[in-house]
């Protein structure tokens, strides 16, 4: 006969085991999402082989912020200008600054490397997965919600930009969490959720400006969910007012330094006419490439089921939220002159939600969620295995060569398209923080971001260019072969380098899997004794209509 105490102990053991099982079920989705983030990091470029030209700039911006905090200079503006003169690929004020705060923190722990920068992006990629899981969980089962997270994380475009040091994924993560808090406010009517939504959406804005489109679908969802009660809810008015005030610094930064971003919203030469059919079909035609056929097909089925009233959980304001989020995003990004597949990503999380909810509600109970999970896992596995990230290889090797070849406090002239790759490569060399890079295009040309926005030439003669290089005390010239040879100034620079004052010291081929024009570089060394006569340098900054100048190292 079993004693009462033994039976009680056995029952407590069963209850404890059941409690641990429930905890494991709750934690399992988060563990799976973390594993997905780890798989993405493991398949990311990590050795200085940035493919997208802006990626090393975003990495350098984080290094700048880390160095600024470490230095705590008495004159931060002068210090920042001096930093730009040494590492002239900075773009920190041209973008919102929030991502760089996190990146600088990771750099402080792991060191300034591409791995640390990429790990920061993957952190947000993982948080994006958490966010879409929590959002979908409001309307679907736990397996289906995890399936939605894996579907979104496995979308080819999302996985691609999750493996580049860019702002798109961090902005999406903040946005999804902000919309999740907003949805909780509508569902549970708690003021703290509304305040949290405003804070998270402001964080998205301070990561990337183009998330601002979400205000329109959120307002329409609010009206659909609350009707005239919106006008009498003081919490809404206080929150909107506080959010508007919180957005003012971001607006100021955009207007002061973000003219290029504003130009992207205007018509640029070579872009599709804004109101043409080809412009408005640009993103729909690319949806299979951006989203992938499995998720796209399931999302279409989910939309049909939603319209037919077959997904009761999404009836009412959730329908307004999900459809408005995607439709308004599509309209917004189509209206912007510069159209790239990655821009539309911010509007695509509802497709994963619809796909998962369709399976969860249309298939037999419990089966649908498991099918959604299987689809999500399969999509992510396929993308990671068969959608490799493009790379450009060779710039880190050139930076290492330069670091090993120049004397203390050396000055290096760089002439090429991917200056960010080279400059960040030098910044990762903590043992050579004394080297200054000077960009030839900043000396000889006047160009804002890219050539199609207009190019001005300094009109120096060949002799003047040679004298400029000599007076600056350039120790090495890193020159992309045949770089912008259609411009007179660049042809004159090439002629100077092929003359008697310089000799080739090394040659590097640029490899990788991304199509590019930068095929090879030649590194030149002066044949004369180098003397640093010029102590100061002033550069035009047409991107914001000003100048940056100061003492050279």
Model-predicted segments: where are they?
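Transmembrane-helix signature of polytopic, membrane-embedded enzymes
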Residues: 29-33, 115, 130-154, 173, ...
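Transmembrane-lumen/periplasm boundary regions of multi-pass, lipid-linked membrane glycan transferases
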Residues: 58-71, 203-206, 212-318, 328-330, ...
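Transmembrane-helix motifs of polytopic, lipid-linked glycan transferases
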Residues: 119-139, 177, 181
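Membrane-interface transmembrane helices that cradle and orient dolichyl/undecaprenyl
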Residues: 137-143, 176-194, 204, 305-312, ...
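Short acidic/glycine- and proline-prone juxtamembrane loop motifs at membrane-interface regions
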Residues: 157-170, 340-341
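Transmembrane alpha-helical segments
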Residues: 358-360, 368-394, 414, 432-438
